[in-house]
């Protein structure tokens, strides 16, 4: 058939193609043929002239270039692939790379399946040119051409629907008319676009003291802000200066500039990401639609993709893409094809187009979860953006960390996306090769916010040359353009200088505005504006197309595709997958709950329905409710950690945030309900609670419902706050209030009148009352002998009372009456707790109301509060003192002198050991499941003094592995072969004599640049070198790496600290500061840098080599200029085989000669570094010729390498070895290490403001809550119990400390592992400094908590008592710190460490003697666990200290009242008993009702609990022993468990 059935968007491919493709839906193979197109757009001409037509791209990947023949049709150059070669070419492609041509054929195959004939579309093809065809020149739609098979045509004739795939992807075709298919052709116009941000202030590093000051100043500042007064308001600073431009549909614009030029700001603001800036001026329109309307009604059509590929890591690639498709499937369905079938076909199409089909069932992963590769993860981001259906997309530095081959695949993927969908695409890239640059239509060059150029990409280079800037041979266009904006790197043409060339950003901006290209761009923009003004069809088509995509139930003004309830259902399915794919989390969750239920159930095993079991039964119910309720705290960090994905997907308009809030709660119900059910059934029946199905299910219902309420509460807290530390501080206060005012510790009638209202606002109190009433309303309590008053006390010789409760006796529990041995459970809870059975279902309604309220708040907050929108980086600086000011002034003076050519960098101070480094027959094998894998295979090589050697190869070839092996960094696997320094095996000093700049920039984030370099110099240079000399050398390194302006900036982390490029320079600087005598290893030193920064790094390495340094450096496909800087090359192919080692030669002559002698002809204009990789099959192309590894092993060059190695060894062995005492494992002594590292750790903790302030805040908050709750207790019986509960809060502190200490230690250990590899300091030093640095804060927290608790509650004022109490609190702090660090040292990850906490804390809390008194414990636990529990010593010591000699006077209502027998006084009847048990008779002479007070002093309370005042110092000593034990575990684990597998 003709092309009549294809919409206009899909025509004008630009090349007639015949190729065999597979239908992604599984249909039989069919021929795709396109007729020549009579004319070509300007875009096609540009791509053809660059040698990059779509056919060219496929042809470039073939083995035989002669298979591609050029064919010219009309005015445009076109190339045809012969039909008989297409299959061979497809077969010869590397399996995991992107082809624009092949991707379009995949698209065409699926499009063919759904395209149908229509009279109207045929009419469109033949109708005369109209205004619509003029618009098409601006939209420049896709070039995919499709044919229907005969079978499909027959179906079309039978009238089986009318559908087109592009229409489904972009808009539904409704009532086709002569104007053609409605399309979302959105051109972007920006006029006088100006962005103003915060500037003019040097922000100082926050520290512990400033965090406290901020906390108390914040309310005052907020009040001032209401009146428009802000003394700390930053000054405005232009980030982008006014600029104008147009990018038409189907065009791609490359945004270039040095770091801080404003590229990210432009990409964000051009796509309506306006958060975080002070003011944005000018106007931005999208096909005539203003930015405000676009944001409100069409938000998902204009999107920004940040450079990080942040996805849900445990979802597979297919699940991630399918979810996006489900939220964006249009309303109009394919006749006869369900929405699921459409999504299946689209998923297959995307996986095939982007060549990630092999990863469909692999999890996406992230930095912590192993998944697909970085390049494949980038393609998942592209697929997700594709699914969004957005028409304007911007991508920010998206090739960071990718090798050149993967980066080119990425650029081609964007080209494919832009062409097929007619999108408008903005991209910023670093180190863009020429192949990438050729994918773009326009380029925007920014220079400190000024536009230096905006126009056609093919004209940019000549424009800059015309200004007077000289380019270099083989220099890529992108590097040249950005280099023109760098005052240090740009070069002027002969006879030109800064006086006659636009040199400043302002001058370059002015020159551009006065240029012919700018005038042309302005005319183009005005024409497009006029078109938009005169003909609203494009705009209306866009609006109508968006409207037609919406499903039933979606408002016309909504920017979402599916309805709110559909969104909930789709997210619900995704969250279920997430939950149940987390096998480790599920298994540990079930195991934790069941084990803790077994422990608690065994402690309270089969509680008797007696008076002795009444209080412990309430304790069991309390623990059952509280444990599950507090496990919901995990919702807080998970809610905040998932914000970036939530924010991005909301920006894509996949779903409303409120839908996510509802769906995530619902998706957690099956798992949480089952976990709580198992916990409840074990706890309930082991504890001997009332045995009936109805009672159990009411218990389970309220435990689960309370959990759901608390889960909703923590989720609400998570979305209401932007900072986790703030949320954690709030949570610590609120949880403390909730636990205290549940009704278990203090009955509501006993609560202070100014705080009792908390009980009625506390969800836990309603849940606890319900399960308490459910239990006690069903049972009667029998008074056992130990609770009968008065009773026989045989050990005191008192035996005259009846064995059964008589009329003159009573039971000493709530609700009892004289002479009655049974107490109704209802009476017990009514008298003691004011709980009633009639409140059960009332409380159910209240809890449901709480849940609905928190869900409503959560939905409101998540909808209207920004969830992670403000992503911008700031630098923070150390406050400048006199010394720093002098150093910085000197650096500034020398920098100007360098620029003026008055100074040269002096490296003469470097003292290198002129010893060769060789390796022979190197093999490396690692264990894998089922066997072993060889990663390095028989590698030979050497590094001579003063040489710069490049280590290159394909991704996965073993470059980093070889570097790790040579640098002695591997700790797993088997290494074979010889690694020799100076002809001898490497010794203990090798690692400290070498420097290794790893690819990951791992640093102590709180240090400044200068401090990081100083610590490296102090610890890695010999101790005898004077400190001043080390400091001076550090200043030289700062100069060499051009870090002068950042010398006092904190390294920080992404978003709060140095940029990626600056962090990379710091990584190199830290290694150079060590003055490595032997060797310098660098792994990807230019990764993530812009072209000029990469050139600066390599240029500096050359200077080091000139001073005698030996350098081995891995690098990803450098441009020709960078490649020329290296002296020697070691090239690896996949499998860890060497394919070349030797000199590169001037202009790469030696390397080129080797390649050409072995059958790989190097084109004259090719970059040898890129070509050699393609020749060996490292890129998309299959290798040229036979196995290059075999060629190398049989080559004379290899024989020469082996001969040279032998000569180097012989020469080295002939020289005498100079014995040096400094050749020890570490450069400095243990004490010097301890002092230096302790100073750094102290600084780190001081600057980690939120970490320490959150800890202190929690202590203050808990101390204040306990004080207010138990303020100045009197000497009543109830107050006696309250004193014990107040002391029990000391056991809460370790839980808070563990939650903070463990992550802190493990994150610090990551830095230590990197530094330990360089032998900076020992593991013992690391562990001790981590411990010692925490001590001052532990002391401060202990003092704060002690003062509030001890004197607020009203404990004894005697100094001996207060001193002991304080010492125990202090030891508790230290114990918690040492325990947390010991657990962290034993754990490989933060998650594993966190799993220990519930077991430890539950065990310690249950067996300490408060919730379960020792007499009530089962024999098994009482025999060993109670005395072994560290908290037993804490509680015993504190209780005996506080209650010893404490006088007790019963208040009215606390007396046990029973009648005296006739003829006897109360003293005669019960006086001996009262004396024996430590109580007293209040009315001894009475002959009526006797008033018995069960305690006279505190001893009577704690002696039955097996606590003794005389053993309190023994308890203190045992507690100290636990601390010592923790420290020993910490030191041993730190020494032997590095938890780093390399």
Curated annotation (Swiss-Prot):
The UniProt record lists the keyword Transport? yes
Which residues span the membrane? 584-604, 618-638, 669-689, 694-714, 726-746, 844-864, 1253-1273, 1284-1304, 1335-1355, 1365-1385, 1390-1410, 1516-1536
Task: Show the catalytic activity.
Answer: itraconazole(in) + ATP + H2O = itraconazole(out) + ADP + phosphate + H(+); voriconazole(in) + ATP + H2O = voriconazole(out) + ADP + phosphate + H(+); fluconazole(in) + ATP + H2O = fluconazole(out) + ADP + phosphate + H(+)
**InterPro entries for this protein:** AAA+_ATPase, ABC2_TM, ABC_transporter-like_ATP-bd, ABC_transporter-like_CS, ABCG_dom, ABCG_PDR_1, ABCG_PDR_2, P-loop_NTPase
Signals that turn on the gene: Expression is induced in the presence of fluconazole (FLC).
Basic and acidic residues composition bias: residue spans:
60-69
Question: Looking at the record, which segments are called Disordered?
Answer: 1-84, 118-141
Which residue range or ranges hold the ABC transporter domain? 221-473, 917-1159
- Give the matching SMART domains: AAA (SM00382)
Q: Which CDD domains match?
A: ABCG_PDR_domain1, ABCG_PDR_domain2
Q: What is this protein called?
A: ABC multidrug transporter AFR1
Organism of this sequence: Cryptococcus deuterogattii (strain R265)
């Amino acid at each position: 058939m003709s092309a009549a059935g294809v919409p206009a968007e899909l025509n004008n491919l630009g090349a007639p193609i015949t190729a065999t493709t597979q239908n992604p839906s599984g249909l039989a193979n069919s021929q795709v043929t396109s007729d020549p197109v009579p004319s070509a757009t300007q875009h096609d001409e540009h791509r053809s002239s660059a040698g990059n037509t779509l056919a060219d791209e496929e042809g470039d990947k073939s083995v035989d270039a002669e298979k591609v023949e050029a064919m010219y049709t009309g005015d445009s150059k076109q190339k045809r692939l012969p039909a008989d070669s297409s299959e061979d070419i497809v077969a010869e492609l590397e399996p995991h790379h992107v082809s624009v041509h092949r991707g379009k054929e995949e698209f065409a195959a699926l499009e063919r399946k759904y395209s149908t004939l229509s009279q109207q579309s045929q009419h469109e093809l033949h109708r005369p040119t109209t205004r619509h065809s003029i618009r098409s020149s601006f939209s420049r739609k896709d070039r995919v051409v499709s044919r229907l098979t005969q079978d499909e045509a027959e179906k079309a004739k039978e009238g089986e629907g009318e559908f087109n795939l592009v229409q489904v992807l972009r808009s539904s075709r409704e009532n086709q008319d002569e104007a053609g298919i409605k399309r979302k052709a959105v051109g972007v116009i920006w006029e006088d676009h100006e962005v103003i941000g915060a500037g003019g202030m040097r922000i100082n590093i926050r520290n512990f003291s400033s965090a406290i000051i901020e906390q108390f100043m914040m309310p005052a500042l907020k009040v001032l802000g209401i009146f428009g007064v802000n003394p700390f308001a930053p000054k405005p600073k232009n980030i982008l200066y006014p600029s104008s431009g147009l990018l038409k549909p189907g065009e791609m614009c490359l945004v270039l500039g040095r770091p801080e030029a404003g590229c990210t700001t432009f990409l964000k603001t051009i796509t309506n990401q306006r958060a975080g800036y002070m003011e944005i001026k000018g106007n931005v329109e999208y096909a005539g639609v203003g930015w405000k309307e676009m944001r409100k009604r069409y938000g998902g059509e204009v999107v920004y993709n940040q450079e990080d590929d942040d996805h849900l890591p445990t979802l597979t690639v297919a699940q991630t893409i399918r979810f996006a498709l489900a939220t964006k499937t249009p309303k109009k369905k394919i006749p006869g094809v369900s929405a699921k079938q459409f999504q299946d076909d689209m998923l297959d199409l995307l996986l095939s187009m982007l060549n990630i089909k092999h990863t469909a069932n692999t999890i996406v992963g992230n930095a912590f979860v192993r998944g697909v590769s970085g390049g494949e993860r980038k393609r998942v981001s592209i697929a997700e953006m594709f699914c969004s259906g957005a028409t304007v997309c911007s991508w920010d530095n998206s090739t960071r960390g990718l090798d050149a081959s993967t980066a080119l695949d990425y650029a081609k993927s964007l080209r494919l996306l832009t062409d097929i969908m007619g999108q408008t695409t903005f991209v910023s890239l670093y180190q863009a090769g020429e192949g990438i640059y050729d994918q773009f239509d326009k380029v925007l060059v920014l220079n400190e916010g000024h536009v230096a150029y905006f126009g056609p990409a093919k004209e940019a280079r000549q424009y800059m040359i015309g200004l007077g800037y000289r380019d270099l041979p083989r220099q890529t266009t992108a590097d040249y353009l950005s280099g023109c904006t760098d005052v240090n790197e740009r070069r002027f043409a002969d006879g030109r200088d800064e006086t006659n060339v636009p040199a400043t950003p302002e001058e370059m901006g002015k020159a551009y505005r006065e240029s012919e290209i700018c005038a042309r761009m302005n005319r183009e923009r005005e024409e497009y504006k006029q078109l938009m003004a005169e003909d609203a069809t494009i705009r209306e088509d866009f609006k109508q197309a968006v409207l037609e995509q919406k499903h039933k139930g979606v408002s016309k003004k909504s920017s979402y595709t599916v309805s709110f309830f559909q969104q909930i259902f789709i997210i619900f399915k995704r969250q279920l997958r997430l939950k149940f794919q987390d096998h480790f989390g599920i298994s540990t969750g079930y195991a934790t709950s069941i084990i803790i239920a077994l422990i608690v159930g065994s402690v309270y095993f089969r509680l008797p329905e007696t008076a002795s079991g009444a209080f412990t039964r309430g304790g069991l119910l309390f623990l059952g409710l509280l444990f599950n309720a507090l496990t919901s705290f995990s919702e807080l960090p998970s809610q905040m950690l998932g914000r970036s994905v939530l924010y991005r997907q909301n920006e894509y308009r996949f779903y409303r945030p409120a839908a996510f809030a509802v769906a995530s709660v619902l998706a957690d119900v099956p798992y949480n309900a089952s976990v709580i059910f198992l916990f409840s059934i074990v706890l309930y029946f082991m504890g001997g609670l009332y045995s009936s199905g109805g009672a159990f299910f009411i218990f389970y219902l309220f435990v689960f419902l309370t959990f759901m309420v608390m889960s909703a509460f923590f989720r609400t807290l998570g979305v209401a706050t932007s900072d986790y530390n703030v949320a954690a501080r709030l949570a610590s206060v609120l949880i403390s209030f909730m636990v205290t005012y549940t009704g278990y510790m203090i009955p509501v009638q006993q609560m202070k009148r100014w705080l009792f209202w908390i009980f009625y606002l506390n969800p836990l109190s309603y849940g606890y009352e319900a399960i308490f009433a459910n239990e006690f309303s069903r049972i009667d309590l029998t008074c056992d002998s130990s609770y009968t008053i008065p009773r026989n006390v045989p050990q005191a010789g008192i035996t005259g009372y009846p064995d059964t409760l008589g009329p003159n006796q009573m039971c000493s529990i709530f609700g009892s009456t004289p002479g009655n041995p049974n107490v109704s459970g209802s009476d017990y809870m009514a008298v003691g707790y004011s709980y009633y059975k009639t409140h059960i279902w009332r409380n159910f309604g209240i809890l449901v109301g709480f849940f609905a309220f928190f869900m409503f708040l959560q939905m409101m907050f998540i909808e209207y509060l920004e969830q992670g929108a403000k992503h911008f980086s700031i630098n923070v600086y150390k406050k400048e003192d006199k010394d720093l000011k002098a150093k910085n002034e000197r650096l500034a003076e020398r920098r100007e002198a360098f620029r003026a050519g008055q100074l040269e960098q002096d490296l003469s101070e470097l003292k290198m050991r002129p010893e060769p480094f060789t390796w022979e027959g190197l093999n490396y094998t690692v264990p894998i499941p089922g066997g072993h894998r060889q990663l390095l295979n028989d590698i030979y090589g050497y590094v001579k003094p003063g040489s710069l050697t490049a280590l290159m190869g394909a991704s996965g070839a073993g470059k980093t592995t070889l570097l790790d092996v040579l640098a002695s960094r591997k700790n797993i696997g088997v290494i074979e072969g010889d690694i020799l320094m100076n002809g001898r095996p490497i010794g203990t000093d090798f690692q400290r004599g070498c420097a290794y700049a790893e690819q990951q920039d791992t640093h102590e984030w709180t240090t400044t640049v200068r401090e990081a370099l100083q610590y490296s110099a102090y610890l890695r240079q010999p101790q005898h070198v004077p400190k001043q000399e080390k400091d001076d050398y550090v200043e030289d390194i700062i100069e060499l790496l051009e870090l002068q302006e950042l010398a006092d900036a904190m390294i920080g982390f992404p978003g709060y600290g140095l940029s990626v490029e600056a962090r990379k320079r710091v990584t190199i600087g830290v290694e150079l500061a060590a003055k490595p005598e032997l060797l310098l290893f660098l792994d990807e030193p230019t990764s993530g840098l812009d072209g000029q920064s990469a050139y600066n790094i390599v240029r500096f390495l050359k200077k080091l080599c000139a001073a005698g340094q030996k350098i081995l450096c891995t690098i990803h496909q450098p441009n020709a200029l960078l490649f020329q800087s290296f002296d020697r090359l070691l090239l690896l192919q996949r499998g860890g085989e060497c394919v070349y080692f030797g000199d590169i030669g001037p202009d790469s002559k030696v390397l080129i000669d080797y390649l050409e002698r072995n059958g790989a002809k190097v084109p004259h204009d090719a970059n040898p570094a890129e070509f050699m990789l393609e020749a060996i099959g490292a890129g998309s192309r299959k290798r040229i010729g036979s196995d290059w590894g075999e060629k190398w092993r049989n080559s004379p060059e290899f024989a020469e390498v082996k001969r040279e190695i032998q000569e180097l060894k012989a020469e080295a062995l002939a020289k005498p070895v100079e014995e040096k005492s400094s050749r020890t494992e570490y450069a400095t002594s243990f004490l010097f290490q301890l002092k230096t590292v302790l100073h750094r750790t102290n600084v780190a903790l001081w600057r980690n403001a939120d970490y320490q302030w959150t800890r202190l805040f929690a202590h203050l908050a808990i101390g204040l809550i306990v004080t207010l709750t138990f303020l100045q207790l009197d000497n009543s019986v109830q107050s006696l119990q309250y004193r014990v509960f107040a002391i029990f809060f000391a056991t809460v502190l370790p839980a808070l400390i563990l939650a903070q200490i463990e992550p802190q230690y493990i994150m610090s250990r990551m830095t230590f592992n990197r530094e330990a590899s360089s032998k900076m300091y020992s593991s013992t030093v690391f562990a001790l400094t981590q411990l010692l640095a925490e001590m001052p804060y532990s002391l401060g927290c202990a003092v704060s908590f002690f003062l509030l608790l001890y004197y607020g509650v009203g404990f004894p004022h005697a100094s001996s008592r207060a001193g002991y109490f304080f010492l125990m609190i202090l030891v508790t702090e230290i114990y918690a710190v040492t325990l947390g660090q010991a657990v962290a040292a034993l754990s490989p990850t933060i998650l594993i460490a966190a799993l220990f906490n519930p077991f430890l804390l539950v065990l310690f809390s249950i067996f300490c003697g408060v919730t379960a008194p020792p007499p009530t414990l089962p024999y098994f636990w009482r025999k060993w666990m109670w005395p072994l529990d560290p908290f037993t010593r804490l509680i015993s010591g504190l209780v005996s200290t506080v209650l010893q000699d404490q006088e007790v006077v019963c208040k009215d209502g606390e007396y046990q009242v029973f009648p005296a027998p006739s003829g006897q006084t109360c003293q005669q009847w019960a006086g001996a008993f009262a004396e024996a048990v430590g109580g007293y008779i209040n009315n001894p002479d009475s002959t009526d009702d006797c008033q018995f007070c069960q305690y006279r002093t505190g001893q009577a309370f704690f002696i039955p609990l097996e606590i003794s005042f005389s053993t309190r110092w023994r308890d203190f000593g045992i507690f100290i022993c636990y601390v010592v034990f923790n420290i020993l575990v910490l030191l041993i684990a730190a020494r032997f468990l590095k938890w780093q597998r390399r």
